[in-house]
């Protein structure tokens, strides 16, 4: 009641002032208070007054908020048609706002807590009888809510900061900060590799220095406008239409795209001549199972002796969690998964699910289908149309150490398989080589340690010969290649930000121009990874497409290494077919 009194007092003041936007906000606050106390008549009255006042104002954010609230009031009152119309108007205002933003960090921050209107529109489209038109419209809203900023960046030219950019001071500051960060990263890694001499206090001090410089680097990148933003002045692109996406699919492909509305998870099944949207489970049921699976996979960090001693129980426990995930996410779709190739488009926490390794009690998904992944169906379609090198060398790079001695064996095996290989090992596997040889390569394979930063995903990195290559560094590379493989630990992990934006190495590689990626979802086993990569590239050279080669490599490695931790860490993203 106190909040209502204060809102009315503020409204009385702003109604007589030259700040009509503030008066609208007061009306919306009064409407929200009434809605939450179930006084729908007052809520409708205040929202209507706010919308009427907006008629003569250019205030798209207020328009978005007002029509979203009015739609929710209509929905609660059972007025589905009126609610739907309000949600559409709210979305249009939001899209107009987003299209005029510059800088991908700003766009992603803008979407935080503003995706509700897309969820409500999906629910509104599916609230009545499912028609082909309502299904297509719902699918369009689902695509609009996924990885839009990444697609914007993929559609715009790559910009690399150079001395001729007119920003030489900023460029020098960036380089100095990157050099300092690489030095501190190396010191931290050296400390961690010496457990008997490790000083937690010293590591903590080094990490404080790292965080300070990372903050400075983010600030400089934002100033210089090279953190992934085009200098062409292009506005935000839209998600592709249903028919544009369909045109990119082969008849053997079924897109399985998930979307969460509230606690409910929906699955969209899109093929060359079908579109279905099926409720499958609740997000709250998935979260705990996924944590248990990740806990099981983390047990391999306890060492090879532990893994060998408890081999059978580790396998059975992991398969049990994979079976539960199958029952929740795929069993409701079992009779509809009739395509040879499944293209999974996850949402939210489902980006951490290894769908290819889900288990029905007898067989894994990869036993029945080839599998690939994409951040959105629109991004998959964009990947199929990318202009990339169809010939050129295979660029092989690796940084072996005592924790990954099989990296050299892996590279030597690939050198014998791939045509026109260029191999760089150790210190010679540098960022300079990648920057200069990468643009002309057809394939790039980097075997090294990956570092996923949950606390600051923009600084997730891979170790190069004398530096660490982060997401920000990838933003400034041009890599128009058919395939980039990172065969290190957790190179495919991302933080899922607002708008289902993936913040990790995959983002930087797609933006740099790669058509497809082969990355890992968790820490990888050294020898099984070498065996997997050898079989994958051998199959690729024999004429199989990337998805077929990945499936064959997984099945071959599983014969010797039956635990999913060892045979199932890798995911193929982007274009999979020839």
Regions found by a protein language model. Give the residues of each.
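Catalytic cores of enzymes
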Residues: 5, 228-578
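Amphipathic alpha-helical protein-protein interaction segments
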Residues: 44, 48, 64, 80-363, ...
């Amino acid at each position: 009641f106190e909040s209502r009194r204060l809102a009315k007092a503020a409204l009385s003041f702003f109604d007589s002032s030259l700040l009509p936007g503030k008066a609208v906000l007061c009306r919306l606050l009064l409407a929200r208070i009434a809605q939450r106390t179930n006084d729908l008549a007052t809520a409708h009255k205040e929202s209507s007054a706010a919308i009427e006042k907006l008629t003569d104002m250019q205030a798209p954010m207020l328009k978005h908020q007002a029509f979203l609230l009015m739609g929710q009031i209509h929905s609660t009152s059972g007025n589905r048609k009126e609610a739907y119309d309000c949600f559409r108007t709210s979305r249009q205002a939001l899209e107009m706002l987003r299209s005029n933003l510059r800088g991908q960090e700003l766009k992603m921050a803008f979407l935080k807590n503003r995706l509700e209107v897309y969820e409500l529109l999906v629910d509104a489209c599916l609230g009545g009888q499912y028609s082909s038109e309502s299904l297509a419209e719902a699918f369009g809203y689902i695509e609009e809510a996924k990885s839009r900023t990444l697609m914007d960046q993929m559609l715009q030219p790559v910009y690399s900061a150079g001395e001729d950019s007119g920003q030489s001071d900023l460029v020098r500051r960036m380089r100095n900060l990157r050099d300092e960060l690489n030095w501190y990263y190396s010191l931290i890694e050296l400390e961690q590799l010496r457990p008997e001499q490790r000083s937690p206090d010293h590591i903590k001090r080094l990490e404080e220095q790292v965080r300070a410089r990372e903050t400075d680097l983010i600030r400089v990148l934002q100033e210089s406008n090279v953190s992934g933003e085009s200098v062409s002045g292009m506005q935000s692109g839209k998600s592709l239409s249903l028919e544009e996406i369909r045109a990119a699919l082969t008849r053997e492909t079924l897109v399985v795209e998930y979307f969460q509305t509230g606690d409910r998870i929906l699955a969209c099944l899109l093929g060359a001549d079908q579109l279905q949207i099926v409720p499958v489970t609740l997000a709250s049921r998935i979260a705990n199972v996924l944590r248990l699976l990740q806990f099981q996979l983390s047990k391999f960090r306890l060492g090879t002796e532990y893994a060998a001693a408890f081999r059978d129980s580790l396998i059975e426990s992991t398969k049990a969690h994979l079976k539960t995930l199958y029952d929740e996410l795929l069993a409701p779709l079992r009779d509809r998964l009739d395509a040879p190739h499944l293209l999974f488009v996850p949402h939210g926490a489902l980006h951490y699910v290894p769908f290819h390794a889900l288990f029905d009690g007898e067989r894994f998904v990869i036993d029945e289908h080839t599998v690939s992944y994409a951040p959105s169906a629109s991004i998959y379609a964009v990947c199929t149309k990318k202009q990339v090198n169809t010939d050129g060398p295979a660029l092989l790079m690796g940084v072996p150490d005592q924790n990954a001695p099989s990296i050299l064996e892996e590279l030597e095996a690939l050198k014998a398989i791939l045509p026109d290989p260029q191999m760089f090992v150790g210190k010679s596997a540098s960022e300079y080589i990648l920057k200069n040889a990468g643009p002309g390569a057809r394939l790039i394979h980097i075997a090294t340690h990956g570092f996923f930063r949950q606390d600051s995903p923009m600084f997730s990195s891979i170790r190069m010969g004398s530096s660490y290559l982060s997401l920000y560094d990838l933003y400034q590379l041009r890599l128009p290649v058919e395939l980039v493989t990172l065969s290190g630990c957790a190179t495919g992990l991302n933080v899922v930000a607002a708008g289902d934006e993936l913040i990790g190495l995959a983002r930087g590689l797609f933006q740099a121009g790669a058509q497809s990626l082969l990355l890992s979802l968790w820490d990888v086993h050294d020898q099984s990874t070498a065996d997997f990569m050898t079989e994958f590239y051998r199959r690729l050279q024999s004429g199989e497409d990337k998805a077929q080669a990945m499936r064959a490599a997984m099945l071959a490695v599983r014969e010797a290494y039956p635990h999913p931790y060892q045979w199932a860490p890798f995911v193929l993203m982007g274009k999979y077919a020839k």
